[in-house]
């Protein structure tokens, strides 16, 4: 049996931009992506701690070291710059494998979105 489990999590990063006129997605600083074991094009679930919104989109690689967390397209309507969000991705795996799997969870400094 296959189940879906948490694979990666960026816990409490700050939204730096919201670009309604861009073609959808979330742009994430490449340093944060690497730390969380996330890749460009990966589907992510986003939770906004400030307003309770929950939505899905996919990742676009942002400039390394920039601290960028930018919601693009329609998702830009779900957040405000300065909001604190949690970004999660999931993986399908065998039930037995999932029992011992440990997700990558990253707690960046939310003031600057930097790895501490």
Swiss-Prot record:
A Gene Ontology term for the protein's cellular component? cytosol
Annotated substrate binding lies at 57, 73-75
Q: What coarse category fits the chief subcellular location reported for this protein?
A: cytoplasm
Q: Name one GO molecular function term.
A: aspartate 1-decarboxylase activity
> What does this protein's record comment on cofactor binding?
Binds 1 pyruvoyl group covalently per subunit.
InterPro entries given in the database record: Asp_de-COase-like_dom_sf, Asp_decarbox
How is the protein altered post-translationally, as described in the entry?
Answer: Is synthesized initially as an inactive proenzyme, which is activated by self-cleavage at a specific serine bond to produce a beta-subunit with a hydroxyl group at its C-terminus and an alpha-subunit with a pyruvoyl group at its N-terminus.
What is annotated as the active site?
Answer: 25, 58
Q: Which reaction does it catalyse?
A: L-aspartate + H(+) = beta-alanine + CO2
Xref: HAMAP family: PanD
Assembly mode: Heterooctamer of four alpha and four beta subunits.
> This chain belongs to which protein, by name?
Aspartate 1-decarboxylase
């Amino acid at each position: 049996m296959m189940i879906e489990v948490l694979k990666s999590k960026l816990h409490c990063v700050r939204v730096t931009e919201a670009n309604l006129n861009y073609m959808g997605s979330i742009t994430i600083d490449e340093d944060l992506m690497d730390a969380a074991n996330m890749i460009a094009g990966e589907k992510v679930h986003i939770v906004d701690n400030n307003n309770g919104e929950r939505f899905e989109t996919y990742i676009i690689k942002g400039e390394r070291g920039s601290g960028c967390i930018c919601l693009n397209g329609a998702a830009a309507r779900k957040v405000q710059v300065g909001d604190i969000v949690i970004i999660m991705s999931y993986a399908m795996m065998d039930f037995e494998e999932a029992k011992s799997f440990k997700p990558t969870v990253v707690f960046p400094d939310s003031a600057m979105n930097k790895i501490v």
